[in-house]
Amino acid sequence: MISSNDFRTGTSIELDGSVWRVVEFLHVKPGKGSAFVRTKLKAVQSGSVVEKTFRAGEMLPQALLEKSTLQHTYMESGDYVFMDMSSYEETRLTAQQIGDSRKYLKEGMEVNVVSWNGNPLEVELPNSVVLEITETDPGVKGDTATGGTKPAILETGAQVMVPLFLSVGEKIKVDTRNDSYLGREN
């Protein structure tokens, strides 16, 4: 059980038979009446977002999520197949379960798969990944690091804004949380 006063961004709770993750929260203490916590919750299974208000100090069941490190091995008929490298057990996730993470997911990558009651829910990518640029405007002599940016398409199909001096075939480091360019990778 967790108190509504202890909510933080990313806290997972069980509500109405499903797992919800706190996206935003605000402790409100009005001049008259009792304090409450206004939250924005996201359903982990479906991705729907709702706003819900709880009394301050209200006890709610905390969702016990299990994280396991698995390797993305291949895709089969729209499903993403992951393997536990110690037990060689396979886990399948649909494109909906993976969500936006699929734009950075490539074969051989190790990720954390979050499960609840033995059912895989979602994939957590590393904070940064190294990917190759497959398509972008060519770099022109004189372009500098302090100049502007241009769109580049990466090997997984993701589009990221990169500095003007980068060209096709170069490997770059990308922040998976906000789709930003972090730097060149050798």
Swiss-Prot record:
One of its GO terms (biological process) is peptide biosynthetic process. Keywords: Cytoplasm, Elongation factor, Protein biosynthesis. GO terms for molecular function: translation elongation factor activity. It is found in: Cytoplasm. SUPFAM superfamilies: Nucleic acid-binding proteins, Translation proteins SH3-like domain. The keyword Protein biosynthesis applies. HAMAP family: EF_P. Involved in peptide bond synthesis. Stimulates efficient translation and peptide-bond synthesis on native or reconstituted 70S ribosomes in vitro. Probably functions indirectly by altering the affinity of the ribosome for aminoacyl-tRNA, thus increasing their reactivity as acceptors for peptidyl transferase. Belongs to the elongation factor P family. This is Elongation factor P. It comes from Prochlorococcus marinus (strain MIT 9303). The lineage of its organism: Bacteria, Bacillati, Cyanobacteriota, Cyanophyceae, Synechococcales.
